[in-house]
């Protein structure tokens, strides 16, 4: 059984307050995009191991047992001891450390895949409860529809938003942005206007009203990321922003851009139609 975990972008990201537990409350809009990994699970014939994990495509750091798809399997195995041994094959196309939620999407899709393959009978709500244990934004990918996210990115409210007909260009430079450092530079401020209201306005107004709070500190430290955003606007983007804490930057366009890869040499560069 195979599935295709997709990425997401953040439309705006406001850090609104620091919590007593040291985390930050935020507000953002998660929007799914058609940039996908591939995840396949097969019944393991040899029962000498509970699982094996084979990763191809973009390289991933870390040990297999720390990968979120393995953590998802172990989480369900704890409650369903009869879960059979599996071979997990994952092709990574969504770049890691990009603010695109690739790892979270893989984990959520693993939960859905195991539920279907082994007929666990989990409801959507129950799968969301499992997913949030693996990461704040994991549960988003269970329903995989646009949401207004609050809390630490784990509380969701559906939003009526469709970007169908637009095209997205996604750029990921070979730069690692520490999420911890990015948060350390933030001074939380509650926005005067909620993102829920901003996205109801024409996209042409978003440039001046919808902001990612991480951009100020990240762009100061990595001006080359800021330059990517500027270049996307120069190419005609209606709206451009960094996703999450970076380092990926996206631009939303009314039509496809030809030969865009030539303009961002040395970067991960993909163009997709939005749905």
Swiss-Prot record:
Top-level lineage group: Bacteria
Broad enzyme group: transferase
Pathway(s) this gene product operates in, as recorded in its UniProt entry: Isoprenoid biosynthesis; isopentenyl diphosphate biosynthesis via DXP pathway; isopentenyl diphosphate from 1-deoxy-D-xylulose 5-phosphate: step 3/6
Gene3D superfamilies: 3.30.230.10, GHMP kinase, C-terminal domain (3.30.70.890)
UniProt binding sites for ATP: 95-105
Annotated catalytic residues: 8, 137
GO terms for MF: 4-(cytidine 5'-diphospho)-2-C-methyl-D-erythritol kinase activity; ATP binding
Any Gene Ontology biological process: isopentenyl diphosphate biosynthetic process, methylerythritol 4-phosphate pathway
EC nos: 2.7.1.148
Functional description taken from the UniProt entry: Catalyzes the phosphorylation of the position 2 hydroxy group of 4-diphosphocytidyl-2C-methyl-D-erythritol.
Family: Belongs to the GHMP kinase family. IspE subfamily.
UniProt protein name: 4-diphosphocytidyl-2-C-methyl-D-erythritol kinase
Organism of this sequence: Phocaeicola vulgatus (strain ATCC 8482 / DSM 1447 / JCM 5826 / CCUG 4940 / NBRC 14291 / NCTC 11154)
Classification lineage: Bacteria, Pseudomonadati, Bacteroidota, Bacteroidia, Bacteroidales
């Amino acid at each position: 059984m195979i599935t295709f975990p997709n990425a997401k972008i953040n439309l705006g990201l406001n850090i609104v307050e620091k919590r007593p537990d040291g985390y930050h409350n935020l507000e953002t809009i998660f929007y799914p995009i058609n940039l996908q990994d591939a995840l396949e699970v097969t019944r393991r014939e040899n029962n000498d191991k509970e699982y094996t994990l084979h990763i191809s495509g973009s390289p991933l750091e870390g040990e297999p047992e720390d990968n979120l798809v393995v953590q998802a399997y172990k989480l369900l195995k704890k409650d369903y001891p009869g879960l059979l041994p599996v071979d997990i094959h994952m092709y990574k196309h969504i770049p890691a450390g990009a603010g695109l939620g690739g790892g979270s999407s893989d984990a959520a899709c693993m939960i859905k895949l195991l539920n279907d393959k082994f007929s666990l009978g989990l409801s959507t709500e129950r799968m969301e409860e499992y997913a949030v244990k693996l990461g704040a934004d994991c549960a988003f990918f269970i329903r995989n529809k646009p949401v207004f996210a609050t809390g630490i990115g784990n509380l969701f409210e559906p939003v009526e938003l469709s970007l169908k007909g637009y095209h997205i260009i996604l750029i990921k430079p070979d730069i690692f942005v520490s999420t911890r450092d990015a948060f350390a530079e933030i001074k939380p401020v509650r926005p005067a206007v909620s993102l829920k209201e901003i996205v109801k306005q024409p996209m042409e107004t978003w440039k001046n009203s919808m902001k990612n709070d991480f951009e100020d500190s990240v762009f100061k430290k990595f001006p080359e990321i800021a330059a990517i955003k500027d270049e996307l606007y120069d190419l005609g983007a209606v709206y451009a922003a960094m996703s999450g804490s970076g380092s990926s930057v996206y631009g939303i366009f009314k039509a496809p851009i030809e030969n865009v890869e030539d303009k961002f040499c040395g970067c991960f560069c993909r163009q997709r139609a939005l749905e």
